[in-house]
Amino acid sequence: MRRYLLATLLIGVLLTGCFSGAEKPKDKIIFVSILPLKYFADKIVGNTWKVEVTVPPGVGPETYSPTPKQMVLLGESKAYYSIGFLGFEQAWLENFKSTNQDLQIFVTSKNVDLIKENEQHPDHIHLQGVDPHIWSSPKAARQIALNICNGMVQIDPDAAGFYRSNLKLLLAEIDNVDSTVTRLLKNVPEKKFIIFHPALGYFARDYGFEQLSIEFEGKVPSPKHLQTVIETAKSGNIKYVLIQKEFDIENAEIIAKETGSKVIQIDPLDYYWPQQMIAIAEKLSNTPQ
C-alpha cells in the first residue's frame, strides 16, 4: 500500500512538472487603431478576445509609429480594425500585413456616409480627401459597430450568435447616446464652435452645428489665419473654443481672450466613447455636468 502511494505521488509530481513546463495557450488577439474602436470591440467580443489598441492615450493618430512590442503582438493577431483614413494607417497597414500574412484587415468606415474635406473644412486636408473622424458621430458609430461585428463573425463564425447578441446591446447604448445628445443640443441657439483640430465634423453634421478649425492645412495656424478665426468668432458670436487634450492650449486661449469665448478641453479619442460624446454635448449646451 505504501509502495502504491509513493508511486502515485511520484506520478503526480511528474505530471505537474510536465504541465507547468508546457506552453500556455496564447491569447486570442485582435487590434484596433484607436481607443473608441477598442470600446466598441470590447463590447462585442466581451472577454473572449484580447483587444489591443495601436494609438495610446494622449497621442494623435496622424503620425504615430507602432512600438516594437506592438509589432510582435501584431504578428500574433487574427484581425486588425482600422478607420481607413488615418495618417498612420496609410503608412503602416501594409507593414502590418507583411509582418503577419494571416492578418485580416477590416475597414470600419465601410458604408459610413463620409465627409469629403472640401464640404466642411477645406483648409485642413487629410489623406484621400476624407474626414476620418467618423467615431464622433453616434449615427456613424452604429455602422462602425456593425462592421466590427461582421468582421468577428467572419474570423470566428462559431461565436456568431454571441457577437450579434452583444451588438444589439451596443446599438441600444449608441442609440441612447444619440437621444441624450439630441436632447441636450436641441435648444442651443448658436450652432457654431471653434476647434483646434477639426475632429467633430461628423458630430457637427449630425446635430446641425458648424465647426471652424484653428489648424490651417493641418499645421499650427499662422498669425494671419489666427486673426481670421478671431474675426469670424466675433462676428458669429461664437461662445466656445474646443481643444483636444493632446494639443497645445496656447492658441485656443489667445482666441478665447480676444473674443470673450470659453476654452473647453475635450477628448474625443478617449476610450469611454459614450461619456465623451455626452460630455461634449453638455459643454456645448452649457449644461452642468
PLM segments and residue spans:
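Short amphipathic alpha-helical "recognition" segments used for binding
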Residues: 6-7, 248
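Extracytoplasmic metal-acquisition and chelation regions
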Residues: 17-289
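Positively charged n-region of N-terminal signal peptides that target proteins for export
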Residues: 1-4
